[in-house]
């Protein structure tokens, strides 16, 4: 505070500079025009004009200037004196979405003229678009229903043209699209049926707007069974480290509102912050477990001592995780609920509730502070201490019953430009420890800065702490203090105020104050009706212009409830109803509103809660929820006169000017509002002349932008099966997950009545509506509920799917909510589709009393595939036999309840997939290809299914699947590169063909960034890379992989940041491995033997590295490249002179290396030699290894080509396409024939069989695609026809060339023809899937699988056993490449992860991975020495009559070398009874 003595004289100096020196200043004309600093095009904007102390008529004009010219916003506006006049204007659309322009305002009269020019930001107005799906999660085969809604920034509907909407699957495929459609009433509905075998995972609906913006909405596709009940876990949200106990409650509630009977198990854990799987549970968490029975209300309560969690220990998370499992009585169905409690060290906390943001010297500074405990509960009757050192203020006060204290600080003697108020309750704990958390009592502190006013006049808006509620009128108090000496004979002073919201001026007003020629002090109120136009944040500015030219003012920010003008209400009548009965849904909204209705089963919301449409989510769509400050380019330069830094001598006192950066002037208040001011009034404080370096603190920069948080469909119409006594028996078979999905229009009275039929599900239906009106805009209803319930019913418990022949237990539970006992008979209707045997020997009628239940079970073995219906009836019987002490009653209505539910039955055996690819180019004519789909003799009956995909781009499938190109695991440094490199080729290709969209670019760059980070995990300290990195004990870098990473990182620099050090280090490391003859030494172990077999090891590796260096690209004159080319040229010369020649693989690499180096002669020589060894068949060309292994016997279809052959053929293709200066027509003809063969080897994802072949082939295909791409307006027609009655047609053009169009083929086995006419090329991919029963055959691996124990004799064998594997290589080579052992789990079992992780301690195991039902084990290689591996599995869900599970071992790089074995659980026959 030592500067205070200097600051005071400086303020006096500033007053001398600004105060008028004679009365002639009185009445000087003042102009002020206020315009938002951000203007939106094609919408109404407002600017406000204030003219004061004028004695003549003036006109006001405004114009906007950009690089393309000037445009007048308004001209010759006549404004009255002392009246705040606001004028509306529109800004034309700009060619760029965001642009800085110059705004010029001119005020002109007979004797007065004022002109000022400043910058504003102009943004094109964009629509607000959201998507609503009927659910957030779907099963395969269900229909996705969704709506696209568009509004303006006032939430009024927009009937805009939407260029594109599409659905994208988890692999990135665009599986459906809708183009160029007009919204009606601001919305449009769509639907899309999912296939029976879709990819499971996260999908999204993408809306592409005309402006180029896009909106995405996610949904999930999974196989699931809806939960029957909710597990509600209640724990304290916060507990402090001092609490000794906590209360936990767990309740089970059915979706129809009744309590769940059953058993609960609760676990409360505090997890270790650095948990480990290797040292048991103690290294992971402190846990407390307990269990018990649910009471009659379905609840369980427990008081838990917190001592076990050691709340003050530091090494553990500051959270308690509570997990509760409820096991339903009878069915043994288990569902889980979770909650967490935050552990806080904060025992008490002080915070300012209301406090002035600035202080004005001489006006008391007000504040209100609240004291709460660690849970936020107010603490009354406690003494708190308040201090404001700059004002010499020290006080204490006692909190009231709400924990509040008010205070007021006299600011008369504050000498500085800031006032800091500190409030505390208790001092910090003196106890500190490295491992311990100490209690904390949080203080509150607030710094307020001085408001600059040379006139010593002020106006101040009272702060408000609460959110302003909709529909109310809020009163704001404005306090003022006026210095009589500045009024200069004025009789009435006008205070003007305006409100800004959503970035624009929305309201204005004036308050007149009669003044006297003396100092005045007082307050007045401003009334603000709270409506949607000022939500979600209102900024209020108040100001007055004094006769001296000084402007006094203040601004305040008020949070406003997210109001919507269209008030929507939704209600069911009745609110509870019987299944299949009639009900009414009543909607009220603004007249003529279009209302979108939705009602879903509460079970769906329990399965996956929705991101519900709400006022908050809609307001989050706004581009500007609040405008404050100026964007960086718009900060104005201060053109006013500055003060020199020389000392001033006045009346014997020397004054030293000091810069008061933090003082708040009127300009700062306007900047807080985001307003640009055109004025000749004094709104700025003086600033120092910039003679020396000075530092200024700028106000907030940038715009505050909010982001989105993220055909009428008929209602389901349930129908009762017609029986003679419809009230006696109910047959329930209609169980939709979405019940209502409708559009309705309310009438002129604002009401719509919708008649509905309640579905058969006994549950609670949750309904919602949003409505759009041209006048009132958007409205959203609160949730309405209808409970579908009947007091006596039967429900079925069964899994999502089962395997044919695998027995499962079907359970039927009869529930009686009648007040009396009933005697019930339960029957399962027989069917040829399954065999059912009662679990209980006797099927006698059961006695069920009030609120009771009875579960009846059958062991069911399905015999048919697909959806199999199960029909179960429960009937209340007339009987005189007592139930307990009473005679059973028979319900008057609904004495028999029948439920019909389907179950998906899947085929047994091992699934096989065969892919047939064709690239057909009609060139104005017609081309066709025959397709014969045959099935092997050992196919599982009814298991075959096939589909055809149609794409207009050769890379279409691959570019949508860059993260899923292989149907294999990605667990090492080389395999990671197949996630990385193809993105570069896709980006290059789309750039060159001008097809690159922002969406694809963004996605590909995202993959490049993550792949780059992941690849650095495999880097060594010396700059090299290896397959599993140093952390797996591979201490030597790998020459081949380092070259691969080097060239790919170098190529990725065009799209993402790559640290040059990684490139330099890898290049240096490689150059150190170059020998004197220019060839490279091999270093590190390669997992792929394809390039290290035979005498030409060194040449092949050297060719690969030379290619990598030239692709960086390094020039041929670079020393390392020059020497490497010498090595290759010498090797080629030797090969030509020798008898044995070169390996085909080596020649393919040499051809491409010479092509890259520009050595056309050598390229032609090698290609000529290769052409002599080419395999030519069916107008296609490829190359094979001379000693190609025999194809395994027993393949029904020719297997996919080996990885090495795809790779070498792709290198030849690259050599043809890299001719200098460009490929000739002969080169392209040869390339086309090669492409025909390569595309036939692609898998369903667009990749190939392994890593290198995928990377090189996609590189080659992208170059071929770019070389042959033509953008034509013509289209190709595709016809797929069977020899029977099936026929399907597609069209492929520029608009849908990247759309994956698909159709299922119904006739299997079958003969099909595929015909293409028109222009362009069409890529057709047929996928045939079927199951087979494994047969004994000769494999190149010996694979043995056993379980320990092998039999069911041991007591633990039901729930746990070991899997023991033995693997060796018996093929034609000395050892395999890297191999993967894939162990599928037996149904109902899961692996024990720590035992799987232990396998990595073996020298032969590089890595392990665990998925939901598979264990993957990576082996460096497999030789003829047997490897033994074992791990433990645990029972997760009981399943009877288990089918065997498959274990597969395969060579990662020669995928046609594999072996299959199967195993079963020791107790496979009777696990269902366990």
Curated annotation (Swiss-Prot):
Keyword Signal: yes
InterPro entries membership: A-macroglobulin_rcpt-bd, A-macroglobulin_rcpt-bd_sf, A2M/Complement_sys, A2M_N_BRD, A2M_TED, Alpha-macroglob_thiol-ester_cl, Alpha-macroglobulin_TED, Ig-like_fold
Reported tissue expression: Secreted in plasma.
Disulfide bonds, paired cysteine numbers: 48-86, 251-299, 269-287, 470-563, 595-771, 642-689, 821-849, 847-883, 921-1321, 1079-1127, 1352-1467
Residues that carry a glycan: 55, 70, 247, 396, 410, 869, 991, 1424
Position(s), cross-link Isoglutamyl cysteine thioester (Cys-Gln): 972-975
Keywords from the UniProt entry: Bait region, Disulfide bond, Glycoprotein, Isopeptide bond, Protease inhibitor, Secreted, Serine protease inhibitor, Signal, Thioester bond
Origin superkingdom: Eukaryota
Signal peptide residue numbers: 1-23
A GO-annotated cellular component: extracellular exosome
Places the protein is found: Secreted
Isoglutamyl lysine isopeptide (Gln-Lys) (interchain with K-? in other proteins) cross-link, chain position(s): 693-694
Family membership noted in the UniProt record: Belongs to the protease inhibitor I39 (alpha-2-macroglobulin) family.
Protein name per its UniProtKB record: Alpha-2-macroglobulin
Organism of origin: Homo sapiens
